[in-house]
């Protein structure tokens, strides 16, 4: 899921 991936990247 790209949306979830994006959120996780921001929280890296």
UniProtKB/Swiss-Prot annotation:
It comes from the Eukaryota. Nacreous layer of shell. This is Uncharacterized protein IMPP11. The lineage of its organism: Eukaryota, Metazoa, Spiralia, Lophotrochozoa, Mollusca.
């Amino acid at each position: 899921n790209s949306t979830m991936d994006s959120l996780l990247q921001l929280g890296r």
